[in-house]
Every structure is written in structure tokens, then in C-alpha cells.
């Protein structure tokens, strides 16, 4: 599916992902570029991968012997630009659920320009929150390692904790210890470490601001 097709499919059901899709490349690129290409390119700054990782997307992979195999995207990346695709295999389908009512999803992309620019940092945070308690956390960060990564220790720390500023601050510090950013033309390692911290604050205060408006 082209990026335009993906945008049409998720516009109403996953508006957070639509916002990312809508600024991917240029209109010309979105008409011909595909989400499958973004996935198998295996770039640590790929825009679609953080979202797909926190949604536990499943990839259908076709091989030369006529039988598809299914693989969770979190098991697809083996290293920098390395995937689990075997010789003769191609990615044919990407399956992912829609966030449920009690799942809070935010997607972030930091770049020098809003449109038509390569990411300096990407992130996806999906928290299941019930009665102000975090029941589950899934967090994927891009441009802070050789692949987009799930910060598993941070996810485990958040489970069962109250959804509070202090808890999210502590989670940000834990996440910093799980990433290994480099310095390049788009940003320094220190800048990316700070972005990791900031994204947890941003997620929290987005929710508090929205709750205040409703009240």
C-alpha cells in the first residue's frame, strides 16, 4: 500500500498515525512510496516503525515455496539495516490493531522542517491507563540506536505505577539508560538523550492539558 493509501485507511481510526503519514516525504513520494518499503529498509529513523512496534504489528512474509510466514515486527530487525527476511522472501501484508478506548497513544517526530525532512528523533508511546494507574506500557524510540527499539526496562517499570509527573520523569531517566544515540549532522547524542527525557514529560502534560479542557 502506498503512503496515500495508508493515510486514507487510518485518517479516522488512528488519527495519530495519520498525522505522521501526512508529513512523510512529499505528495509525490506518498503516492508511490509504500509502508512496506519503509519497513524493510530497516532504517533506525523510519517514521512508521515506532507506531507499528507499539501496536505489535504482524508482518506477512511470502517465500519462494508458496507458504507465508507471520512475524511480529518487534522480531523483524536484527541489527542496523538487517532484517529477518530470508533470500527470496518479500513482505506482502502489514496487520495492526486500532488502539482501544483505554489506550493512550502519542507519536512524535523531531526534524528540522515539519515536512519533507529526515527525522532527528522519533517515538511512540502507548499506555493503557485505568483509574489513573498504568496497566501496560509500550514505548518505541527511533534514531537512538542501530534500530528502532522498544525500551523494555522502562515499560516494565511503568506497569502498575500511578500516571503521575514524577513517575513519567523517572521513566524518562530509565529510558535514557536503554538507548545509545550517536552524533550526526541532524543532532548530537546529548540532544537525542534530552529528547528521550522530554518525550515522557510531553506525553504526560498532553493528557493533563486535555483533561483540564474537558473539566
What are these regions (language model features)?
Residues 1-215:
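C-terminal structural segment of proteins
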Amino acid at each position: 500500500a502506498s503512503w496515500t493509501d495508508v493515510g486514507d485507511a487510518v485518517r479516522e481510526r488512528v488519527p495519530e498515525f495519520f498525522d505522521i503519514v501526512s508529513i512523510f516525504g512529499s505528495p509525490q513520494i506518498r503516492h508511490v512510496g509504500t509502508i512496506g518499503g519503509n519497513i524493510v529498509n530497516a532504517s533506525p529513523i523510519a517514521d512508521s516503525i515506532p507506531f507499528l512496534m507499539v501496536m505489535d504489528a504482524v508482518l506477512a512474509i511470502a517465500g519462494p515455496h508458496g507458504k507465508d510466514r507471520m512475524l511480529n515486527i518487534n522480531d523483524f530487525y536484527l541489527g542496523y539495516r538487517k532484517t529477518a527476511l530470508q533470500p527470496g522472501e518479500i513482505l506482502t501484508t502489514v496487520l495492526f490493531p486500532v488502539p482501544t478506548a483505554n489506550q493512550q497513544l502519542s507519536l512524535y517526530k523531531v526534524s528540522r522542517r515539519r515536512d519533507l525532512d529526515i527525522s532527528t528523533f522519533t517515538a511512540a508511546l502507548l499506555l493503557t491507563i485505568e483509574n489513573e494507574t498504568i496497566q501496560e506500557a509500550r514505548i518505541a524510540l527511533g534514531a537512538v540506536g542501530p534500530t528502532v527499539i522498544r525500551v523494555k526496562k522502562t515499560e516494565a517499570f511503568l506497569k502498575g505505577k500511578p500516571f503521575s509527573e514524577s513517575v513519567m520523569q523517572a521513566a524518562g531517566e530509565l529510558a535514557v539508560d536503554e538507548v545509545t544515540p550517536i552524533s550526526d549532522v541532524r543532532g548530537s547524542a546529548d540532544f537525542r538523550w534530552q529528547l528521550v527525557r522530554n518525550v515522557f514529560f510531553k506525553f504526560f502534560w498532553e493528557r493533563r492539558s486535555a483533561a483540564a479542557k474537558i473539566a
